[in-house]
Amino acid sequence: MTNLVQFPGLGLSFHLNRVAFTIGGVSIYWYGVCIAVGLCLALVFAFRHSLEFGVDPDSMVDVILIGVVLGIISARAYYVAMAPFKYESIWEMIAIRDGGLAIYGGVIGGFLFGGLACKWRGVPVLPMFDLTAMGFLLGQGCGRWGNFFNQEAFGCNTTLPWGMYSEATRAYLMSSTVTVPKGVVIDPNLPVHPTFLYESIWCFVGFFLLFRYIKKRKFNGDITLRYLIWYGAGRFWIEGLRTDSLMLVPSIGLRVSQLVAGIAVVAGIAAEAYFTRKFKGKPLLVPLALNAENKAAQKKLDGPISFAGKDTQLLASSPRKLFLEKTEAYNAQVKAAIEQAGQKKA
């Protein structure tokens, strides 16, 4: 089934099919494809830049798997919790082929369970959070296009030239589930704000800005806090345009997600100001990442092999190539020391 989507002010129209392709009779939806593309981009970024954060790429595999799986489950749980009585069975609650993943649920679950996984695997938590925050921006920027193919998560009427119209937007705006501030009038026959596009652009711009800032970060967790501030500010504004949000205070149009976004922004600004002042004048030093092989070998010895000196850490502002070279040399040195210690023990 196709859906005609129009942008009258731009003279553009698209025939969209929610199904991207079929494998063995199973339909693969564009919604899932968009999420998968975003996830792949996030993974590529994480593995490419992990050493610059002092994170061993092999050690973070388990963290990523746990964070992704439980993050998706949390995203669905958050979405269902916002309107639990509209589902007739448990199967409807867990079905995500038609959409229904709440980003904030995924963010909360990803950070929470990912943090626990970091403790389990011996991965530094805050540096991993910084990598994750960058990945979230890529994933969210791509994932929002799944809403476009599903024709969901759009806003109220607009006269702007990029206003969007389709039979899906019209049908939804004629339903009883529309949520808008008290006094706001909705015309189902007029174009609406493509809020999925706003959020996608906001996330990609945020990724670009934070990517430029990586080498200038002042402390571990700096990128994470700036992500919370940036995404929260954008989400607060964009959420106010949408017509499918759970209202917290209908009289003033305050949504639940706006409250969460507002808390994230305020808390993020407060924490950023505090830690920036605390670490003022102190350049961030990143410990070189010990690989999984050396970590496992150290556990067999009486104590860890460590080396004091400048060759065990680098300034966060150091180029990626230097991190690669120094990390490789450091792990070779540790491996040799472990082998020597093992021979003495034998």
Each PLM stretch: what is its role?
Residues M1-A346:
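A feature for loop-to-transmembrane-helix boundaries and adjacent hydrophobic helices
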